[in-house]
Amino acid sequence: MEAANESSEGISFVLLGLTTSPGQQRPLFVLFLLLYVASLLGNGLIVAAIQASPALHAPMYFLLAHLSFADLCFASVTVPKMLANLLAHDHSISLAGCLTQMYFFFALGVTDSCLLAAMAYDCYVAIRHPLPYATRMSRAMCAALVGMAWLVSHVHSLLYILLMARLSFCASHQVPHFFCDHQPLLRLSCSDTHHIQLLIFTEGAAVVVTPFLLILASYGAIAAAVLQLPSASGRLRAVSTCGSHLAVVSLFYGTVIAVYFQATSRREAEWGRVATVMYTVVTPMLNPIIYSLWNRDVQGALRALLIGRRISASDS
């Protein structure tokens, strides 16, 4: 009975990671270190280029800068600990460390989702309402969209963490993951977790699904507008405006769905860990590449930043 009511204080967990094979750990360390450094450099350069270039002081780039900053932080929540565990023998993490990691993982993941929805709305306004675009996507409107994204995500995350902190853990403390995700921890708890599971399927799903539905609605309206354009060049220009965003949305939500809307067998759990790597490590690294490949203004700002040349709005 004492074990069943074990206090949460002093508890530590063991992160089992992606593999227990010593022969795979060093190659994985090198791979993920390269991906992480590329993510930091890519997203950091995007933020710096947007700040340094007056030509990029526009709503879509303001939102992109916040997305890149969120991606930079998102990768930093899980990857450093994963890299350390690939080299160290001690894979333990305290309960406080686990909850802290989970808090920022939830918060930054939802921030990404909300910012992608805000960027879809920006694309919608740019294509469907080009004349009043400056009024509809004013500085105040952009600040409100970004502020709402950060506020909603942190309130959502705080709610989860306050509930998770009340759980007791009396079974094995081995977490079959490379970071503290909520589902593995819920399976280790000996408390009644029905209220948290209910929250995940209601509030949690709403926080993730609502931005996704807004993105679908925005792109539905965009598609209808594009089909009405008389010239092929106009349609191509409209598609290129939002092509990079659509690629990022597909990558992000594709992997999220693969992780959180799947069965719970061992094979699916293993695939879930691989998919989690995709949206916590690979997607933040690919986003700057996708946006710079599709956008000449970003390419020009990055070149100017790297060679130390200052560009003005007239250079665009």
Curated annotation (Swiss-Prot):
<feature type="transmembrane region" description="Helical; Name=7">
    <location>
        <begin position="274"/>
        <end position="293"/>
    </location>
</feature>
<dbReference type="GO" id="GO:0005549">
    <property type="term" value="F:odorant binding"/>
</dbReference>
<feature type="topological domain" description="Extracellular">
    <location>
        <begin position="261"/>
        <end position="273"/>
    </location>
</feature>
<keyword id="KW-0675">Receptor</keyword>
<dbReference type="Pfam" id="PF13853">
    <property type="entry name" value="7tm_4"/>
</dbReference>
<feature type="transmembrane region" description="Helical; Name=4">
    <location>
        <begin position="141"/>
        <end position="159"/>
    </location>
</feature>
<keyword id="KW-0716">Sensory transduction</keyword>
<feature type="topological domain" description="Cytoplasmic">
    <location>
        <begin position="122"/>
        <end position="140"/>
    </location>
</feature>
<dbReference type="InterPro" id="IPR017452">
    <property type="entry name" value="GPCR_Rhodpsn_7TM"/>
</dbReference>
<feature type="topological domain" description="Extracellular">
    <location>
        <begin position="160"/>
        <end position="197"/>
    </location>
</feature>
<dbReference type="InterPro" id="IPR000725">
    <property type="entry name" value="Olfact_rcpt"/>
</dbReference>
<dbReference type="GO" id="GO:0005886">
    <property type="term" value="C:plasma membrane"/>
</dbReference>
<dbReference type="InterPro" id="IPR000276">
    <property type="entry name" value="GPCR_Rhodpsn"/>
</dbReference>
<feature type="disulfide bond">
    <location>
        <begin position="98"/>
        <end position="190"/>
    </location>
</feature>
<feature type="transmembrane region" description="Helical; Name=6">
    <location>
        <begin position="238"/>
        <end position="260"/>
    </location>
</feature>
<dbReference type="GO" id="GO:0004984">
    <property type="term" value="F:olfactory receptor activity"/>
</dbReference>
<feature type="topological domain" description="Extracellular">
    <location>
        <begin position="81"/>
        <end position="101"/>
    </location>
</feature>
<feature type="topological domain" description="Cytoplasmic">
    <location>
        <begin position="294"/>
        <end position="316"/>
    </location>
</feature>
<keyword id="KW-1015">Disulfide bond</keyword>
<dbReference type="GO" id="GO:0016020">
    <property type="term" value="C:membrane"/>
</dbReference>
<dbReference type="GO" id="GO:0004930">
    <property type="term" value="F:G protein-coupled receptor activity"/>
</dbReference>
<keyword id="KW-1003">Cell membrane</keyword>
<comment type="function">
    <text>Odorant receptor.</text>
</comment>
<feature type="glycosylation site" description="N-linked (GlcNAc...) asparagine">
    <location>
        <position position="5"/>
    </location>
</feature>
<dbReference type="GO" id="GO:0050911">
    <property type="term" value="P:detection of chemical stimulus involved in sensory perception of smell"/>
</dbReference>
<keyword id="KW-0297">G-protein coupled receptor</keyword>
<keyword id="KW-0807">Transducer</keyword>
<feature type="transmembrane region" description="Helical; Name=1">
    <location>
        <begin position="27"/>
        <end position="50"/>
    </location>
</feature>
<feature type="transmembrane region" description="Helical; Name=5">
    <location>
        <begin position="198"/>
        <end position="220"/>
    </location>
</feature>
<keyword id="KW-0472">Membrane</keyword>
<comment type="similarity">
    <text>Belongs to the G-protein coupled receptor 1 family.</text>
</comment>
<feature type="transmembrane region" description="Helical; Name=3">
    <location>
        <begin position="102"/>
        <end position="121"/>
    </location>
</feature>
<keyword id="KW-0552">Olfaction</keyword>
<keyword id="KW-1133">Transmembrane helix</keyword>
<feature type="topological domain" description="Cytoplasmic">
    <location>
        <begin position="51"/>
        <end position="58"/>
    </location>
</feature>
<feature type="transmembrane region" description="Helical; Name=2">
    <location>
        <begin position="59"/>
        <end position="80"/>
    </location>
</feature>
<keyword id="KW-0325">Glycoprotein</keyword>
<keyword id="KW-0812">Transmembrane</keyword>
<feature type="topological domain" description="Extracellular">
    <location>
        <begin position="1"/>
        <end position="26"/>
    </location>
</feature>
<protein>
    <recommendedName>
        <fullName>Olfactory receptor 1K1</fullName>
    </recommendedName>
</protein>
<feature type="topological domain" description="Cytoplasmic">
    <location>
        <begin position="221"/>
        <end position="237"/>
    </location>
</feature>
